[in-house]
Amino acid sequence: MPRRNDLNKIMILGAGPIVIGQACEFDYSGTQACKALKEEGYEVVLVNSNPASIMTDPELADRTYIEPLIPEIVEKIIEKERPDAVLPTMGGQTALNLAVSLSKSGVLEKYGVELIGAKLPAIEMGEDRELFKEAMARIGVPVCPSGIASSIEEARQVAHEIGSYPLIIRPAFTLAGTGGGIAYNQEEYEEMVQYGLDQSPMSQILVEKSLLGWKEYELEVMRDLADNVVIICSIENFDPMGVHTGDSITVAPAQTLTDKEYQRLRDYSIAIIREIGVETGGSNIQFSVNPANGDVIVIEMNPRVSRSSALASKATGFPIAKFAAKLAVGYTLNEISNDITKKTPASFEPTIDYVVTKIPRFAFEKFPGAEPILNTQMKSVGEAMAIGRTFQESFQKALRSLETGRFGFGCDRHETLPTLSHLRSQLRTPNPERVFSLHHAFNLGMTVEEIHELTAIDPWFLDKLEDLVKTEKYMKQRSLKDLTAADLRYIKQQGFGDRQIAFATKTTEDEVRAYRKSLGITPVYKVVDTCAAEFEAFTPYYYSTYEPEECEVLPSDKPKVMILGGGPNRIGQGIEFDYCCCHAAFSLSDAGYETIMVNSNPETVSTDYDTSDRLYFEPLTKEDVLNIIEAENPVGIIIQFGGQTPLKLAVPLQKYLNSPDCPVQTKIWGTSPDSIDTAEDRERFEKILHELEISQPPNGIARDYEESRVVANRISYPVVVRPSYVLGGRAMEIVYSDEELERYMTYAVQIEPDHPILIDKFLENAIEVDVDSLTDSTGKVVIGSIMEHIEEAGIHSGDSACSIPYTSLSDNVLTTIRQWTEQLARALNVVGLMNIQYAVQGDQVYILEANPRASRTVPYVSKATGRPLAKIASLVMSGKTLEELGVTEEFIPQHVAVKEAVLPFSKFPGADTLLGPEMRSTGEVMGIDSDFGKAFAKAELGAGVILATTGTVFVSMSDRTKEAAVPVVRELIDLGFKVVATSGTQKVLREHGIEGVEVVLKLHEGRPHVIDWIKNGQIQFIINTPSGEESQLDGRTIRRAALDYKLPIITTIAGGKATVAALRSLQDHPLDVKALQDYLG
């Protein structure tokens, strides 16, 4: 069937901010969909609240709305734009839930808008647990014994019918298992049921008999309007049932299915997608197989593009989201051409002659109090993927891609082996470190059978891992020169890195590299081509392997530039850096360079086969990057866009490129590694600041507790302490006493023994300011934007809301900031981007830090000002001047854009929600409007904060902030809110003339206390600033209850003032919507 000509304008719903369970994969799918529909001549309207996404670039869609993804706002956009259809399958769970809401409320019918990609009955049947179960019964596909409950009483009845624990709780219409879990007894069960009902938007849960120990598989399936169905990829979970698939190591294609079992899953998948009624596009279907007898049960399906779709796309080269968008407008699979081969249609199922492994990355260290245990609720914050000719090769490459300080399956550090009893408990309970517990187990002599008994991991995988430990022992018994060429090739084919070989043979990585090359053992690069080399591939998408085959890298005469990506997402380094890498690839391709992207993250736009001219899906380690440099011989390498990942490689790369035996003429483009090191090295940086007469907070350096105590007492408490060389404020804290400092030093020095601890005076009640600037090789400096933070200095900049333009900075302060930025950019010889953070106390400005690289604010600044900083910076690095590019002065927009952080506390039930100097947000949203109040209100709504415009506010302030809270409380009363407070706060308010404030009891003062008020729905939002030790427990419990009951909680005075401005705006007039293209002219 040809494309539908009855549609002209199509709205795509995005996924919003990056959260656990919904990350960059939806930027990837949304970007592909925008391109595919525009290619077909449709007018595209995009709605998404995430400024860090490529899809919200103004040139990607015809009309781009960076607005909150809530039904009331999307209705206004529909009313304004009058699209013919809405495509909801590209924006994850957020977009599906929005589509259901707009459909059921009658909005789509009112404006004559059609749902394409998935109709309402298909979405509901795929997402509603009861309807899905009924559908499976109709087609004879077995499901797990289960029952649906909408109350505790119903849940008790379901548990009685199933008959035995453990039971699995799965809330309906939630993302990444939010609110779910495994209950081993009745008490746990009832707690989890209540939590699950609260988390489900429709207060419905599915209770299932536990299939712990069964194997888990996924199939990626596509269907068109002519009822053609293709299976794109099978994926096997290394971890058995009981661990969320997003937290499990996964392998494609499935390794341990018999042909008969695979055919059965395939037949079931085709029957399921037809019965559910997904007419056009992709679905992900999850199965469980009993290893004892081969019984199959279907677990669930996602009637949309998913995290697994992104993985399947990158694993096979088959662009699922692009094809799904084309199917949604009427094409059939056989009418769509495969871009990679240019010969085969999309109905030609991909075949792959390699193995792909994905390993998740966790951030439990960011959430003290949260147990590092994996279950059915997803907790990982990112993932790395690797490709190899064997499972062993791809598995070890994926482990070293994670960037967690490990270089493969062990064999990379001296370790004390645990006791057998401790090890058994580590193996029995799924946790992020379990993969290395397997390594310990083989070293302690445990058998495959014993380990399988404890973990239920398939013996096939365990055999392969045991084989790696045998190779490790073989290497440790020999010197490097004892290893023959055949030995070394076999070792490299198993995925061992040079670093691991060096550890085993007691040599250095450089010695291993030199010896390996002297024996002629170098990697070859193979193409990901969707067809196992049956047809020629036209898109250079490569992976390395050590099989003795020919290298498939295509020669080229164009000058090449290599861009090093950011690796797996983590807190502190996410989509913002991928955005910068993509922009570099786009602008340098347009300038005539051949761009080479190196990255290991399957979720991102940068690892899409058509973002750069060449893509290497490889780990970002010294060994892997040097191998690619030698294969490609680029003229330049860009390291300043991928966050800390490529920066860590700067010095070793420079050392290699300067060495006499380097066979290539490659240069690192932009700011030199030496200048980057100067900014990172406290002593070198201070010397420059001293020469330039730039102030910084009083500070010092310490290597142990005694030194740190002397420094802290010299500069006076409170102080900020942190290790040198960090991103995302890792292990950074504000301490108020010698006792707190001693606890910190004991904990933090273990983290970075090689680097000293930095101690700075903490500037209380200071305003923090971020500046992004551009500098060219002539020393011309142009400020991209000056951003004013809403939370005061001391809250990590990545967790703080901020505003463009600034709202309260004086002319004197602005002059100082601009002068210091220019002086520092020149002193550091910056070429490209630099980010500087300042703190302002009154009219006194202090510099906090300077980073001569792309920062996480670059996409936000680019969207707010319309000036693509990363594109400009990459052209500057290629030798262009800012004058030539027409960028000569700072641009201050007439509108206001507010960026707000999105935090993942709901996934970590034990963690405190209080913000501090260590970054914990996973993503961000932007609100844009004509004034600050409206823009901040939109940012809060986009971040999921429900701002009530009437009702009761509970106020509990620390002694330090009680005075400052008075004006905020006065304004809330002016706005018509009822204010209630703790006795101490009420006393201060009364002293300042605020009468009639009711006292609410603290937890230890009797009942009904504040938590009772929260649970009874008597409070609409909370202002609670953290107090001293004795009331910390109260504050923590209140903050946690606010999160569980979805109440807005403000923990700073500055946040209170901004919220008052937003509430005033919302009361004055309803929010309006406007396309980004109209703001930017």
From Swiss-Prot:
Annotated keywords: Amino-acid biosynthesis, Arginine biosynthesis, ATP-binding, Ligase, Magnesium, Manganese, Metal-binding, Nucleotide-binding, Pyrimidine biosynthesis, Repeat
Start and end residues of each stretch annotated as Carbamoyl phosphate synthetic domain: 554-944
Residues annotated for Mg(2+) 2 binding in this entry: 300, 302
Residues where ATP 1 binds: 129, 170, 177, 209, 211, 216, 242-244, 286, 300
Record pathway: Amino-acid biosynthesis; L-arginine biosynthesis; carbamoyl phosphate from bicarbonate: step 1/1; Pyrimidine metabolism; UMP biosynthesis via de novo pathway; (S)-dihydroorotate from bicarbonate: step 1/3
Enzyme Commission designation: 6.3.4.16, 6.3.5.5
Residues involved in Mg(2+) 1 binding: 286, 300
GO molecular function: ATP binding; carbamoyl-phosphate synthase (ammonia) activity; carbamoyl-phosphate synthase (glutamine-hydrolyzing) activity; metal ion binding
Leading EC class: ligase
SMART domains: CPSase_L_D3, MGS
Organism domain of life: Bacteria
A Pfam family of this chain: MGS
Domain ATP-grasp: 133-329, 686-878
Substrates-to-products reaction catalysed: hydrogencarbonate + L-glutamine + 2 ATP + H2O = carbamoyl phosphate + L-glutamate + 2 ADP + phosphate + 2 H(+)
Matches recorded under InterPro entries: ATP-grasp, CarbamoylP_synth_lsu, CarbamoylP_synth_lsu_oligo, CarbamoylP_synth_lsu_oligo_sf, CbamoylP_synth_lsu-like_ATP-bd, CbamoylP_synth_lsu_CPSase_dom, MGS-like_dom, MGS-like_dom_sf
Residues bound to Mg(2+) 3: 837, 849
Entry-linked HAMAP family: CPSase_L_chain_A, CPSase_L_chain_B
Domain notes from UniProt: The large subunit is composed of 2 ATP-grasp domains that are involved in binding the 2 ATP molecules needed for carbamoyl phosphate synthesis. The N-terminal ATP-grasp domain (referred to as the carboxyphosphate synthetic component) catalyzes the ATP-dependent phosphorylation of hydrogencarbonate to carboxyphosphate and the subsequent nucleophilic attack by ammonia to form a carbamate intermediate.
Protein name as it appears in the record: Carbamoyl phosphate synthase large chain
Organism: Synechocystis sp. (strain ATCC 27184 / PCC 6803 / Kazusa)
Gene: carB
